[in-house]
Design a protein with these regions (language model features):
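FIC/Doc superfamily catalytic core
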Residues: 1-338
């Protein structure tokens, strides 16, 4: 069994057999470790052992972070490979901590703070807006680059995108429509690329925490197994080459987000996104949806919150639904009758 499959298997056992607290911790660690793949990084066996001790309640997340930090401080003869592993280990532990925290504020300042907390001591510019323009060669674009925001317009662009999103109303939208909009928002702020490095990981953590404010339960499998796909999907959402018939599209990102928060089963393959890929039989826009007692894709967020509680407890009373969701009794009755 490969090292990658080994950590996935070991952490999955806590989800299958663990207590509720262990499940939540394991999911956070799986997402945290999987996200390192967006920059081609892999975590160490020591990180996995530390994660397991945290999941089992033997140490706190702060103690886990201190262990990882101390482990690398003692290893003064590190190779370049170990330096990359150090970054992956430290950042994984920090992501796990952030995902375990309920606190969140929707603002550019929050995104900058997340970046600082993830990369402080790893990058000298953690949490700081870049002061120069950048390009990045992308495999999915045959070596071409996305056009990122100019460094001197980053702050204004961030403020505009966040203000626009804050004013956007999700009321009466189906969950599927919400996914499309969230994918577009994620691709827009990622294109700004406000940081010198670590943009995709910071974007992922920010979006996970933002989506949780809507009541979505994030499926850790998506980031655990498809982090590089996530990055390539962001790239394709922001790249045009009209001369060669290539248009920016969020369809790949929408499929990823749909798997992430709705539990759909789109096949996420990086080769499908390559600009040279041609397939007339590309998978349908209609996904495979796991069997459920209700169609979540057509629900509004308000309806989904109520239906999820009914699905978990079919005998739940209307007054309990009112208390759990904060909705009015008339709203709860309307949803139950629809």
């Amino acid at each position: 069994m490969s090292a990658e499959k080994n950590w996935q298997f070991e952490l999955e056992e806590y989800i299958k057999q663990g207590e509720p607290g262990q499940i939540e911790k394991s999911e956070a660690w799986q997402t945290a470790i999987g996200l390192q793949a967006v920059d081609g990084l892999k975590t160490s066996a020591y990180l996995l052992d530390t994660a397991k001790e945290h999941i089992e309640g033997k140490i706190s997340i702060d103690e886990a972070q201190k262990r990882i930090q101390s482990y690398y401080e003692q290893r003064t003869d590190r190779t370049e490979v170990e330096n990359n592993t150090k970054e992956a280990d430290i950042v994984s532990a920090r992501i796990a901590k952030l995902l375990g925290e309920k606190a969140f504020q929707f603002s550019p300042a929050e995104w900058l703070t997340i970046h600082r907390r993830l990369f402080e001591g790893v990058f000298t510019h953690a949490g700081q807006i870049r002061q120069y323009n950048i390009t990045k060669k992308e495999w999915v674009l045959k070596g071409d680059t996305v056009t990122y925001a100019a460094w001197n317009s980053i702050k204004d662009t961030l403020d505009y995108d966040f203000a626009t999103e804050k004013q956007y109303s999700y009321e009466d939208l189906s969950v599927e429509q919400c996914v499309k909009h969230l994918a577009k928002f994620a691709s827009d702020i990622w294109q700004i690329h406000p940081f010198c490095e670590g943009n995709t990981r910071a974007t992922a953590v920010f979006m996970i925490k933002y989506m949780k404010t809507f009541g979505f339960k994030v499926n850790n499998d998506a980031f655990e197994k498809n982090s590089w796909y996530f990055r390539n999907a962001l790239v394709r959402a922001n790249y045009n080459d009209l001369q060669n018939g290539i248009h920016a599209t969020t369809k790949f990102l929408e499929m990823f987000f749909s798997n992430l928060i709705l539990g759909t089963e789109y096949e996420l393959k990086n080769r499908y996104m390559h600009v040279d890929y041609v397939d007339d039989n590309f998978q349908s826009v209609i996904p495979k949806v796991p069997k459920s007692q209700f169609d979540t894709l057509e629900c509004t967020l308000e309806e989904l919150a109520v239906l999820k509680l009914i699905y978990k407890n079919p005998s739940i009373k209307q007054k309990e639904l009112v208390a759990e969701t904060g909705k009015s009794l008339s709203t709860v009755k309307r949803i139950m009758e629809s």
